Amino acid sequence: MFGNAGGGKSTLARRLAEITGLPLYPLDAIQFRAGGGKVPHEEYLKVHADLLRRDQWVIDGFGCVPSAWERFAAADTLVYIDLPLLTHYWWVTKRLARGQFATPEGWPEKSPMWSSTMGSYRVVWLCHRSLTPRYRQLVAEQASAKRVHHLKSPAETRAFLQAVQEENGLTRHRNPDRPARRPGVDEAPPER
């Protein structure tokens, strides 16, 4: 799961994990401590490498450039959220407003909302300028080797989720015959 800041990656990753039963690992929860402080970079890289050695996962977040490209190479499925630039800015702003009342999805507890949001505005522009062209090239190159989903609108994201539900024998509601799984709870991330 990758794309620019404020594109709904954490929400989509959570829904995918719920539907498929795959374990979810939000990188922000691995890369940052409660309150927003970063873990040492080597510690993050070790935990990230341990995640990639697992058989199945949904990983949400960016991490750092080298770990992102390692993750893309290891994944059997790539989900790229590529929304219009203004949508990313708007959704970052909505996240700031909602974050006044509850921690945003995928964020460490007690993260500083204001400074994190200001950083997200900067990241949206930098990602759009530097990474978006590389991401688009990646999905074009990998389309024949991996399952690639290039989602360019909220409607395409909803259609993708619906297709995943159907593929997993689910409709709008959870299949009662399938045991409920709590990704990230039933399976803990590797030790740091």
Predicted regions and their residues:
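Residues at the beta-strand->loop junction immediately N-terminal to the Walker
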Residues: F2
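The conserved Walker
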Residues: A5
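Conserved lysine of the Walker
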Residues: K9
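Hydrophobic positions on the alpha1 helix immediately C-terminal to the Walker A/P-loop
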Residues: L12
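NTP-dependent small-molecule kinase module
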Residues: I19, V123-R192
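Post-Walker A helix-loop "phosphate-sensing" segment adjacent to the P-loop in P-loop NTPases
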Residues: I19-Y25
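Conserved nucleotide-sensing/catalytic segment adjacent to the nucleotide-binding pocket
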Residues: Y25-T77
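A glycine- and Lys/Arg-enriched "phosphate-lid" helix/loop adjacent to the NTP-binding pocket
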Residues: L83-L131, T171
